[in-house]
Amino acid sequence: MLRNIFRLICLMLVLSFSFSIVSCREQVADDDMIDQPIVLNMNTEYKLAENLPEGNGQRVKVILLLGQSNASGSSIVSYLQKNSSKQDFARYSAGYSSVLINYCIDDHNVCSEGEYLPVDLTCGAAEGFFGPEVGMADALAAAYPDETVLILKYTMSGYSLHHHWLSLGQRGSIYNAFLIFAKENMEHLEALGYDARIGAICWMQGESDTTQAKADRYFDNQSAFVSYLREDLEPYAEDGGIYFIDAGISNGPYCEPGYPTVNEAKRRFSELSPLNIYFSTIDAGLTTVNEPEGDPDWGHYDALCELELGRIFAKHVIESYRER
């Protein structure tokens, strides 16, 4: 028991330290390098699934989960267990055989090695942490009990849209690495005989764009970003197009001073197309202030809130399929 507690404390220290370093680094980049290109050396060697049966023409829904650490999964499993009923936690732990996830987190730091695995509580940024895929799977499995849903998760904790997903408004290092991941997996699904279509992109990002200079550019950056996504992924798009489901960021101290500007940019962008969906995590009551008790991790959602984040994503995914 003590060993597990010590391990949890160590993991929290690592994540918190990493978040602080990135935040400080981004402040410097914002002041001194806002209009300078930044190139990351990304690993684009992706393994392809060997655990899927032949598709034989089976139609499958594919959902992309993209963003930074709250998409990676930095919420604490032990608090989810503490605050859930035994029946609910048993369901989350057992996983969802009809909702499979292939994930690459933080440039292969944590990944499924190309395999599609049942979503459970082990798909987060580190051992003992989970992401929004759990709430997504809980809702998607209930909505589509006789179907297989695939989640492709590609996230980079602590990196900005302005400097890293994009660079000077063009496709940047993270975007290009993600695109290889997505294309190779979609082509592999086709080669296995699946009729796989991307129906929605769930985007949980913006915390690292909250220096005011980056926040002021978020609307233009997101407009470019989503146009690239739809252009590059068009061959794999579901009938009716790819929905972009965009979560607002929190109003916690790590999102000062620019979170109102970022969230307003997200809201404005959602008005440009019926395929763009925005929801406010602040209005939804999602908090970052309670866990761990006594020393909260202000950057990441409390466990039940991370679960709800995934459920809200799934709600909009389900509604998007009804509207096609």
Describe these PLM feature segments:
Residues M1-C10:
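Bacterial N-terminal signal peptides that target proteins for export
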Residues D30-R324:
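Cell-envelope and extracellular/periplasmic
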Residues S20-S23:
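C-terminal motif of bacterial Sec signal peptides marking the signal peptidase cleavage site
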Residues I5, S18, D30-D32:
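Intrinsic low-complexity, intrinsically disordered segments enriched in polar/basic residues
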